[in-house]
C-alpha cells in the first residue's frame, strides 16, 4: 500500500484521526468535530462542492448536515488513500449518500464530467481541506 497516510491517532476528544507520513494530522488533534463545525459555518451555501482531502469524514458529514441538497465530490490522492480511510474509518459507508461521490485525483475528470451539470448545480465551490 502506498498511501499518504501512515497511521491513526486519537484526538483529545477520543476520536480517531488519520496521520500523514509527514507526521502531521489532517484534523485538529484537540476536537476534530468542533473544527469541522467551525469550517462549515464559514462556508456559504453552494450547490456543488469539490473537497480535496476526506480524512475521517468529519468535515464532509457536517457540510452534508448544513447543506443536505448539495452535491459533494470528495477527492483523495489515490485509491490506496481511500482504502486506508475505509479500513480505519469505514469512510465509504459513513459517507454513503446519493449526493457524495468519493474519487481519486486520477478519476477526478471523469467524476466531474458525470456529476457536475451547471444547469442543475449553478454554483461551484472548491474547498481545500488541509
Question: PLM features: what roles do these ranges have?
Answer:
Residues 1-130:
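N-terminal donor/sugar-recognition subdomains of glycan-related enzymes
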Amino acid at each position: 500500500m502506498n498511501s499518504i497516510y501512515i497511521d491513526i491517532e486519537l484526538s483529545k476528544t477520543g476520536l480517531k484521526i488519520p496521520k500523514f507520513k509527514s507526521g502531521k494530522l489532517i484534523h485538529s488533534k484537540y476536537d476534530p468535530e468542533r473544527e469541522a463545525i467551525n469550517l462549515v459555518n464559514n462556508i456559504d451555501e453552494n450547490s456543488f462542492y469539490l473537497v480535496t482531502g476526506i480524512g475521517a469524514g468529519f468535515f464532509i458529514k457536517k457540510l452534508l448536515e448544513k447543506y443536505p441538497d448539495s452535491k459533494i465530490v470528495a477527492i483523495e490522492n489515490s485509491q490506496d488513500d481511500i482504502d486506508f480511510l475505509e479500513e480505519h474509518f469505514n469512510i465509504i459507508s459513513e459517507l454513503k449518500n446519493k449526493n457524495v461521490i468519493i474519487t481519486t485525483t486520477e478519476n477526478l475528470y471523469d467524476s466531474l464530467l458525470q456529476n457536475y451539470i451547471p444547469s442543475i448545480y449553478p454554483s461551484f465551490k472548491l474547498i481545500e481541506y488541509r
